[in-house]
């Protein structure tokens, strides 16, 4: 069984005190259709990148995605880097950039449950790094998986927006071992445009993964 958030604004509260959830990894996964072999070989497949804005209760704010930890700026889950950290603050770590490899599992961000009362909020987003905004071809789905709870599923649906950046979901950490997942699915011109809508206040400069 799973909880599906159908419309923008729909939300579901997860209680981390249920079952084994307080000791298991919180898994935020983006999966999408990468097309058949020929699409991957000749460049017709759409490659998505998963990322997040996050804010801690101590006021720390940052963002994590493949652009941020490219050029050797990432690290393993035990280190603190532009890829985040699982063992230390922010207790949020991106597993790595898929780069269109065709892997069935897509991209994943892990949240350490020992840090849930240190985290205030996250906005989960995806963007198309290269190519046209063919959202309808992606069948993109975000799943929030907490052991001992039903998965919370946010589907993008058949979108035809020509903007290449999409805020998919917001996670609100209640400070009481709870997480509320809210569906967004709003489209933006890029990181800075999304930042303005959701009030993060970062400054941006052009970047690349290559």
Placement of each model-derived feature along the sequence:
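Intrinsic-disorder/low-complexity signal
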Residues: 1-121, 125-210
């Amino acid at each position: 069984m799973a909880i599906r958030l159908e419309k923008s604004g729909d939300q579901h509260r997860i209680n981390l005190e249920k079952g084994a959830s307080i000791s298991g990894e919180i898994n935020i996964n983006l999966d999408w259709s990468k097309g058949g072999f020929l699409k991957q070989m000749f460049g017709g497949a759409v490659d998505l990148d998963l990322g997040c804005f996050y804010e801690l209760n101590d006021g720390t704010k940052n963002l994590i995605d493949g652009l941020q930890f490219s050029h050797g700026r990432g690290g393993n889950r035990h280190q603190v880097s532009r890829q985040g950290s699982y063992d230390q603050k922010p207790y949020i770590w991106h597993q790595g950039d898929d780069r269109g490899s065709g892997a069935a599992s897509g991209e994943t961000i892990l949240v350490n449950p020992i840090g849930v009362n240190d985290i205030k909020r996250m906005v989960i987003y995806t963007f198309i790094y290269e190519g046209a905004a063919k959202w309808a071809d992606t069948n993109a789905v975000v799943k929030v998986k907490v052991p001992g709870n039903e998965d919370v599923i946010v589907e993008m649906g058949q979108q035809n927006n020509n903007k290449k950046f999409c805020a998919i979901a917001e996670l609100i950490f209640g400070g009481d071992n709870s997480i509320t997942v809210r569906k967004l699915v709003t489209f933006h011109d890029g990181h800075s445009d999304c930042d303005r809508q959701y009030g993060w206040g970062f400054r941006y400069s052009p970047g690349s993964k290559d």
